[in-house]
């Protein structure tokens, strides 16, 4: 079977039907989730928009009285990200949330269209997203997952275009701090121009945010990050340590397990950066950026569509089980499915693409064969 081609003798017919099925499923499922959301529609988006409105009103952006992750109105994002929400905050309710939700759908659609994989794989990703509970949940909440997915997809596509790659890494880091680990990958693969471009974008964003929001805003941001209660005991947290705690393991041992998880993930990222292909190293870092988070919400799993696309492109059709394990039809599965899915997505590209005995520190970046063949 040729990698990236739909299996079976009916592949041409499947290829023609796939876009229709993918669109119908995605629109139906996501539409149903949004229609039934009620007051939870835009739950996270409202926190972003209110922070932007506080900025517009000259008030303090961060509410340091909240100390529970996931609490209503909690805003943990960086000052530069607040500026991105300002245009939406200028709109009246409920148009602000509607516009934000539409922007998330557009961002995800653009990301899928730009994935450096073949057309049928892109439509498979749309289909899997339509079935994905994490994706529907992220859109319902107005969470930043689709924006981050776009940044990561752009970084993958622009891997050999340093300025664009650097900008994509920087914007991803502004959206969520954890993708900053991509800079480690870029350093280890000697993408100095991309690192420089990314740091320049970050420096510019910090300077603008400081001028607009004030120097004290950074202190308030760090204060609220420090004040959030213990992540292991946070409800609905899907890190390995938190899942073990929910299953009955003591807080101390669960915390130790989470430390082991973090150290192991970091070690794998470093190893993948220097011992596998640039693409595998990048996707490993992208997946790890979420698995390293002290609080792993279920909607973060929508980002696993990225390594899934890479695996499907190479004919590993079993990879569809990664997002399907957290699909809306299997929502009854136990919480442990989330850390397992993340770890499979982290290790599978390495297992498929590892090149033993070859160090990429001395290797020039390789062009993606899919991009090279596309017009």
Where are these regions (language model features)?
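Primarily membrane-embedded glycan-assembly and transfer machineries that use lipid-linked glycans
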Residues: 2-165, 189-313, 358-375
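Contiguous hydrophobic segments
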Residues: 143-152, 172-178, 241-253, 322-341
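Membrane-interface alpha helices of multi-pass inner-membrane proteins
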Residues: 163-186, 285-292, 325-328
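Membrane-embedded alpha-helical segments of transport systems
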Residues: 174-177, 204-208, 318-319
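Aromatic-enriched
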Residues: 312-375
């Amino acid at each position: 079977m040729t990698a990236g081609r739909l299996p079976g003798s009916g592949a041409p017919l499947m290829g023609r039907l796939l876009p229709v099925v993918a669109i119908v499923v995605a629109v139906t499922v996501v539409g149903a989730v949004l229609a039934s959301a009620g007051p939870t529609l835009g739950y996270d988006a409202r926190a972003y928009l209110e922070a932007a409105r506080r900025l517009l009103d000259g008030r303090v952006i961060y509410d340091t009285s909240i100390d529970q992750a996931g609490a209503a109105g909690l805003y943990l994002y960086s000052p530069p990200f607040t500026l991105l929400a300002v245009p939406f905050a200028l709109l009246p309710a409920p148009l602000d949330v509607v516009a934000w939700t539409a922007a998330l759908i557009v961002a995800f659609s653009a990301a899928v269209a730009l994935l450096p994989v073949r057309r049928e794989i892109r439509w498979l990703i749309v289909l899997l997203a339509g079935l994905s509970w994490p994706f529907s949940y992220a859109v319902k909440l107005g969470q930043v997952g689709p924006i981050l997915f776009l940044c990561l997809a752009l970084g993958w596509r622009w891997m050999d275009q340093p300025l664009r790659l650097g900008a994509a890494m920087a914007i991803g880091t502004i959206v969520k701090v954890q993708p900053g680990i991509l800079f480690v990958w870029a350093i280890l693969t000697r993408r100095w121009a991309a690192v420089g471009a990314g740091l320049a974008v970050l420096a510019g964003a910090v300077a603008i945010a400081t001028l607009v929001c004030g120097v004290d805003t950074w202190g308030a941001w760090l204060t609220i990050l420090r004040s959030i209660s213990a992540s292991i005991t946070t409800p609905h947290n899907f890190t390995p340590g938190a899942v073990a705690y929910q299953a009955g393991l003591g807080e101390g041992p669960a915390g130790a397990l989470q430390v082991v998880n973090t150290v192991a993930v970091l070690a794998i990222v470093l190893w993948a950066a220097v011992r596998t292909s640039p693409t595998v190293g990048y996707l490993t870092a992208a997946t790890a950026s979420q698995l390293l988070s002290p609080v792993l919400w279920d909607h973060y799993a929508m980002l696993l569509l990225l390594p899934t696309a890479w695996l499907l492109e190479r004919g590993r059709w079993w990879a569809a089980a990664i997002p399907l394990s957290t699909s809306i039809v299997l929502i009854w599965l136990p919480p442990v499915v989330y850390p397992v899915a993340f770890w499979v997505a982290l290790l599978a590209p390495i297992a498929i693409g590892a090149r033993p005995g070859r160090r990429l520190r001395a290797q020039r970046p390789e062009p993606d064969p899919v991009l090279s063949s596309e017009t």
